[in-house]
């Protein structure tokens, strides 16, 4: 697959009449964004150098079963990073996010934050088919093994034709 040459993507609420979301920073609110659903998948936990619970680490390169074109460059492998992103060409262990594009990271970041899944605070997991790769950071805590605020985020990349995504959601 290939990402469209756009810099802004937006989440479209499929039921705006039922939406009553308002966010006030620091209010300890729990928010949810549902951008579609995937079929049932079989996942494998990601280990970083054989270790499941890590802070600021990267695993890879992991071979993709297809060629993925990202901003005009073809990639056949990916790095899964513990802080909520995947990168191409090299791993990324920085816990502090930077602006995009920054010129050095070929990255897709569904939620780049200082995740720390130590102490049983969630896990990164992967599912791969012949035409897709799904990475989910599932119920991960934040820095210093904190478990009171957790995030789950997912990134899906495909060959551009995969039926794993609903019709119209593959870009190419």
Q: Whereabouts are the PLM-identified features?
A:
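Von Willebrand factor type D
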Residues: 1-172
């Amino acid at each position: 697959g290939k990402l469209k040459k756009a810099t802004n993507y937006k989440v479209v609420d499929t039921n705006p009449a039922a939406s009553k979301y308002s966010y006030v920073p620091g209010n300890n609110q729990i928010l949810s964004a549902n951008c579609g659903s995937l079929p049932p998948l079989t996942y494998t936990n990601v280990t970083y150098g054989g270790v499941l619970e890590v802070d600021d680490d990267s695993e890879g390169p992991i071979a993709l079963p297809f060629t993925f074109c990202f901003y005009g460059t073809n990639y056949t492998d990916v790095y899964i990073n513990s802080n909520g992103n995947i990168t191409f060409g090299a791993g990324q262990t920085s816990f502090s996010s930077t602006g995009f594009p920054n010129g050095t990271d070929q990255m897709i970041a569904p939620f780049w934050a200082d995740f720390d899944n130590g102490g049983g605070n969630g896990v990164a997991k992967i599912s791969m088919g012949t035409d897709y790769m799904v990475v989910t950071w599932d119920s991960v805590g934040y820095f210093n093994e904190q478990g009171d605020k957790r995030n789950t985020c997912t990134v899906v990349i495909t060959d551009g034709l995969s039926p794993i995504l609903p019709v119209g959601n593959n870009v190419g």
